[in-house]
């Protein structure tokens, strides 16, 4: 069985607290975008793993392998699997590629073995792999809260067009959170942005990301990319997640295509895409 594992952007991210166990409370608007990996899993006589990216190995650090192990232990699955991962979403990008792959693995094994799960059980399994996995599993525009397990779908009024621009250097999510200063970082108004998306109002000036503050310290290329996008005429420019991808977003397809044309010789990874509204 084959599934697409769609990337996401954080249209805004507010990290407002830290718990005693070190985990952070957040509110975020997350949008799935038309950019994806493909994951194929089939029951096999022996475990096999193939990936078109040599650095994504068959280890416990691989989110797909981790998800399969969790499901095998939880549901006493004794089968072996042939796994083929066609990886397109860059790593250390803030686009949720690894968590999207894990969510796809859950959907596939759930279907193959006809596993019955409540929403609560799905979210519990997802959170064992990563905070973004519950969002990736449902794959709809949403306001996400708590540690990532609280998901409220948002009916987007409009389709938005997006240019992704990623420096070749990445950002460690762990290091970004370690350097996060809640008194100095941005705290965007997430409920206000949610209202604008539902009503179709202009979203100019409503975007923000708490993790830009530490990410800028870890990777100055992110600052440079933001400046270049703004110089090219982009109005809504933001880093996604913990970076290092920066995006600009607009309702006007041609506006984003024009900016893409101006950025084509920048030397960065560039991709034009759009939101998935359903």
Q: Regions from the language model: what does each represent?
A:
Residues 247-249:
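Short hydrophobic/aromatic beta-strand micro-patches
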Residues 93-119, 123, 135:
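DPxDG-like acidic metal-binding loop motif
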């Amino acid at each position: 069985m084959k599934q697409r594992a769609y990337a996401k952007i954080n249209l805004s991210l507010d990290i407002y607290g830290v718990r005693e166990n070190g985990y952070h409370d957040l509110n975020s608007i997350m949008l799935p975008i038309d950019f994806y990996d493909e994951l194929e899993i089939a029951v096999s006589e022996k475990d096999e793993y193939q990936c078109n990216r040599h650095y994504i190995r068959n280890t416990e650090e691989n989110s797909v392998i981790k998800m399969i192990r969790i499901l095998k232990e939880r549901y006493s699955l004794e089968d072996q699997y042939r796994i083929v991962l066609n990886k397109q979403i860059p790593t250390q990008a803030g686009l949720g590629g690894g968590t999207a792959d894990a969510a796809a693995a859950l959907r596939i094994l759930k279907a193959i073995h006809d596993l019955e799960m409540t929403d609560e059980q799905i979210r519990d399994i997802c959170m064992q792999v990563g905070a973004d996995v519950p969002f990736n599993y449902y794959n709809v525009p949403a306001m996400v809260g708590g540690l990532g397990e609280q998901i409220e779908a948002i009916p987007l009024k409009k389709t938005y067009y997006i240019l992704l621009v990623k420096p070749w250097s990445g950002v460690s999510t762990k290091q970004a959170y370690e350097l996060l200063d809640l008194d100095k970082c941005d705290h965007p108004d997430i409920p206000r942005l949610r209202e604008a998306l539902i009503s179709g109002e202009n979203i100019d000036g409503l975007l923000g990301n708490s993790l830009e503050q530490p990410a800028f310290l870890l990777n100055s290329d992110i600052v440079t990319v933001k400046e270049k996008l703004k110089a090219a005429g982009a109005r809504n420019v933001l880093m996604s997640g913990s970076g290092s991808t920066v995006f600009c977003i607009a309702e006007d397809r041609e506006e984003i295509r024009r900016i893409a044309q101006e950025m084509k010789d920048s030397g960065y990874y560039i991709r034009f895409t759009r939101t998935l509204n359903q």
